[in-house]
Structures are given as structure tokens and as C-alpha cells.
Swiss-Prot record:
This is Uncharacterized protein T19C3.5. The keyword 4Fe-4S does not apply. It comes from Caenorhabditis elegans. Glycans are attached at residues 32, 145, 271, 369, 405, 415, 465. GO terms for cellular component: extracellular space. InterPro entries: Bactericidal_perm-incr_a/b_dom, BPI/LBP/Plunc, Lipid-bd_serum_glycop_C, Lipid-bd_serum_glycop_N. The keyword Transferase does not apply. Disulfide bonds join 164-204. SUPFAM superfamilies: Bactericidal permeability-increasing protein, BPI. Residues 1-29 form the signal peptide.
């Protein structure tokens, strides 16, 4: 007897599989542990409660394979098969779960589905007779129990199914539309039983064999260099198999964020704390190495740069090489500028002087150390950038408040301590009076450069219409952040 696998239990299985894949998709990693993600009980409650949103979108997309039944009688033999069998109506089941040391157990209750399609039959006695009609299958009270666990293979997440049982409280199959009732009578009863058997008995093995294999192939093929916008990428690698308890499932990972094809080798600095008394749906520990990789690659690729020129009206007078007796301009401090470049302007080109870095402290908060080179050129910079006049260095020490915005962790600039010094000069000695007179321009531009670094942010994985809730919080500890994340469905 040849038969194909189908039925509403496969659809429930696909829901559970989608939820498990969604769970694992929150895990990013690379080489050395720099990130820990803990999925707490409220996380699974949320996605179990809102799983119908995923199901309602995904179930109608499922292609239902053919069901085929050979049959025979004393006068001949034949075969009947389904055609264009698809989902006409679907009622989402209720999904519950329980965490354990071995993984997670999911079960569904309720739920109903109606399948509609066509059947085609042929029967051979002396000649071959063909007939066709319609088929409806109604399944209600669908119950499925399944255990699943996640593990890593080559640093990528994988899913394995443990126990799986299915029970359908009621399943009815209707066959009609034939003009040869005697032919239908030959196969109706065994064909209906086969449809029921396929739906009721084969769902788990099909899910284990087909769905899980496909899911694991997909998960294993996920890129380890993930675009998160503006040519920044997350590199990730699962360092070990997940750890499960009755309260949470936890993933240890290593991750970095880099620009383009830059490389970074983050290290685990400090020890993670326990989750707070109100951990939220998801708790994540983020090493200072991750944002430091981000700004390291930004420095390597010269992304932090600002040009202050005469095109900015508020600073144009100060950038002149010539000005009156009572005027204040850069030329007043440098005789060489007045004599060799009269009636011109100087451009100030700001860029990172050395690799910036973050420091995180439970007592002091988040601090960003960044030194900016300020190169002086005769305007326009685009034509004279090979002839640098002088270089200043502006050292900034900024306190930063981390905050959550949409699906990213950003930093808000609080206070900055800014000092300027001379690196070299080709236009004579640079007097302290010049540094004092131009401190406002240097400070204003340096703060803008700091804000540009903080604006990139660290991405938090999200899914479809699931967003961060206002109850989400972030805390600072010695050399890492701890984020307690709640989600909401919009």
C-alpha cells in the first residue's frame, strides 16, 4: 500500500517548530564567550499565547501531499488518490509548555481544521473506468505532546525532537460527487480509514523526518556574518550546547559587531551576574567587547569623520586666514597663514586618532574614551588634503547612558571632558591662546563625533510584528551590560 503523509497534526507540529526556531534565533555567537542569552518562562508563555499569530500566517502556506490508496474487489482492481487537497478553514489551538533540564515540552489542546480537495479514481475490470468527486476532512480537538531540545553543530543552532504523541478527539471524512456510486462503495470505507490513519498516526514521524531535517538544514545554512544595517555585521558562533532548567533555557555564545569585512577577536571580560528578581522574558548579558569591536572596526574603516569648513555659517568668520584688528580668526594666531594664504579659509578635518574604547563599571556607568585628530588644511579640503598644515588631538572622556530604542541598544551622551593638545605643526608654534579661543569649536565638533559613534547601536533580534515592550530595562555592571527584555505583539 502506497501512501503519502498529511493532516492537521503536521500543521500543529509546524507551529511548534516555528516557535522553537524563533527561540533559537535570539542566539548570536562567534568564538570567545561575550554574550549570554537566557530565555525565561515568561518568554515561552508569550510566544505560546501569541503563537496563533504565527500559525494564522504560516498554515495557509502549507502544501499538502497526495494521499493514494490501491483497492481491489472480486471483479477488478483500482486506485484512488487525492488532488488539490488544501486548507479551507483553520482554528488555532491553545499552546502550553513546560521547561525541564532536558529541554522543553509543548502540548496543544483544541484547534480544528477543515481540508477540502478532489479525489480521482480508476478501476479496471475488462476495461478501465474513471471517476472523480470532492473530499472534505474535519478534525477537531487536536492534541499533540512533543518534547524538543536545541543543540549546536558547527556553531549553528539545531533542533531535535524527543517524544511525540498525537490524539484527535474527532475526525470525519466525507467523500462525494461521484456519478458511479458502486465504484465509491468499493473504496470509501478503506480510503476514509487511510485518511484518518495518515492524519492520526503519521504526523510525528513525518515531522521528525521531514520538517526537522529541513529546519536543521536551514538553521545550519544560516550565515554567520549577518547584516544588521549600514554595512555593519554580527559575527556569531554558539560555543556549547544550551543549558536548560525548569526556569529557563540558556545559551552561551561569542559575538562581535564589525563593519564590512573587518575582523575582531573579542574576549570575555568579567563574570556574569545572576538575573535580577524581575528578569523579564529574556535576559541577556553583553560583554563590553561587543561594542568595542564595533568602534574598533569603525576606526579601522575611518567611519568617524567630520569636516568643519566655511560652509558652516556660524564658524566661517573664525576659519579666515585674514581678519581685522578687532576680529578673531585663525590667521591672527599664525603669521604663515596670513602671509602665504591671505584672504582664504582653513578647513578642520576631524577623525579618530586612535582606537576608541568603552569601559563599563557598576559604580561609574558606561564611559567612552575617544581621541580625535583635527587636521588643518587650506580650503577646499578636497583639493589640498595632501598638504596638512597642522594636527591637533582632542581627547574626550564621555559618560554614556545606555537605553533601549526599538530593537537596538543605544547610548545617550551625558557629560564629556574634553582637552586639546598639539601633535605637530607646519605653520609655526601653536599657542595655548589659540587652543583656548577655539575650544568651543573643538568641543562642539568632538561631541558630535561621539554622538555619531553612539548612534550605531547594538541590535536585538526581533521577529515579524514582535517588538520590545516599554517594561524592558538595561543595567550596567563591571565590563558588561545586562538587559531584561519584554516583548509585545503589534
Amino acid at each position: 500500500m502506497e501512501k503519502s503523509v498529511s493532516g492537521p497534526n503536521i500543521f500543529n507540529m509546524k507551529l511548534l517548530l516555528l516557535l522553537l526556531i524563533l527561540t533559537i534565533s535570539f542566539c548570536y555567537a562567534f568564538n570567545n564567550e561575550t554574550l549570554k542569552v537566557r530565555l525565561n518562562v515568561p518568554f515561552f508563555k508569550f510566544f505560546s499565547k501569541n503563537g496563533h499569530h504565527v500559525v494564522d500566517e504560516e498554515i495557509p502556506k502549507i502544501t499538502i501531499p497526495e494521499i493514494r490508496l490501491p483497492f481491489s474487489s472480486s471483479i477488478g482492481h483500482g486506485v484512488v488518490r487525492t488532488d488539490d487537497l488544501k486548507i479551507e478553514k483553520f482554528s488555532s489551538p491553545k499552546i502550553d509548555f513546560k521547561l525541564s533540564k532536558t529541554g522543553i515540552n509543548w502540548w496543544t489542546t483544541g484547534g480544528a481544521i477543515k481540508l477540502s480537495g478532489r479525489w480521482h479514481a480508476k478501476f479496471t475490470e475488462v476495461i478501465t473506468i474513471r471517476d472523480k468527486g470532492w473530499l472534505n476532512a474535519y478534525a477537531t480537538g487536536i492534541q499533540m505532546n512533543i518534547s524538543a531540545a536545541a543543540y549546536q553543530l558547527d556553531g549553528q543552532p539545531q533542533v531535535k525532537i524527543g517524544d511525540c504523541t498525537v490524539q484527535i478527539q474527532k475526525l470525519d471524512v466525507e467523500i462525494g460527487g461521484s456519478v458511479l456510486s458502486w465504484l465509491v462503495n468499493l473504496f470509501e470505507t478503506p480510503f476514509s480509514k487511510l485518511v484518518k490513519k495518515v492524519i492520526n498516526a503519521q504526523a510525528c514521524s513525518a515531522a521528525k523526518g521531514i520538517l526537522i531535517e529541513e529546519a536543521n538544514r536551514f538553521l545550519h545554512s544560516l550565515p554567520s556574518h549577518v547584516d544588521v544595517g549600514a554595512n555593519f555585521y554580527v559575527d556569531y558562533f554558539l560555543t556549547q550546547n544550551p543549558h536548560a532548567t525548569s526556569e529557563f533555557t540558556e545559551f552561551d555564545l561569542a559575538a562581535d559587531i564589525v563593519y564590512g569585512k573587518s575582523l575582531c577577536h573579542p574576549i570575555n571580560i568579567g563574570n556574569w551576574t545572576d538575573a535580577s528578581s524581575t528578569p523579564g522574558m529574556l535576559t541577556s548579558w553583553i560583554s563590553v567587547s561587543i561594542p568595542n569591536c564595533l568602534i574598533h572596526s569603525a576606526h579601522q574603516n575611518q567611519l568617524v569623520k567630520l569636516l568643519v569648513s566655511k560652509d558652516i555659517p556660524v564658524v566661517e568668520p573664525y576659519l579666515r586666514t585674514s581678519c581685522g584688528f578687532l576680529g578673531l580668526c585663525i590667521g591672527k594666531f599664525f603669521k604663515k597663514l596670513r602671509n602665504e594664504y591671505p584672504n582664504n579659509h582653513v578647513d578642520l578635518f576631524f577623525h579618530t586618532y586612535s582606537t576608541p574604547y568603552f569601559v563599563m563599571s557598576e559604580k561609574e556607568g558606561v564611559m567612552l574614551n575617544m581621541s580625535l585628530a583635527v587636521d588643518l588644511f587650506i580650503n577646499p579640503y578636497a583639493k589640498t588634503k595632501q598638504n596638512i598644515l597642522a594636527r591637533l588631538v582632542v581627547d574626550t572622556f564621555s559618560t554614556v547612558e545606555p537605553f533601549l530604542n526599538h530593537t537596538r541598544i543605544h547610548g545617550r551622551l551625558q557629560n564629556s571632558t574634553i582637552t586639546a593638545r598639539v601633535d605637530f605643526s607646519n605653520i609655526g608654534d601653536i599657542p595655548k591662546a589659540f587652543l583656548s579661543a577655539f575650544s568651543s569649536i573643538l568641543s562642539m565638533t568632538a561631541r558630535e563625533a561621539v554622538r555619531s559613534v553612539l548612534g550605531v547601536g547594538i541590535p536585538i533580534p526581533s521577529y515579524d510584528n514582535v517588538t520590545l515592550a516599554d517594561s524592558s530595562t538595561i543595567e550596567v555592571f563591571d565590563q558588561f551590560l545586562r538587559a531584561n527584555i519584554d516583548f509585545e505583539y503589534k
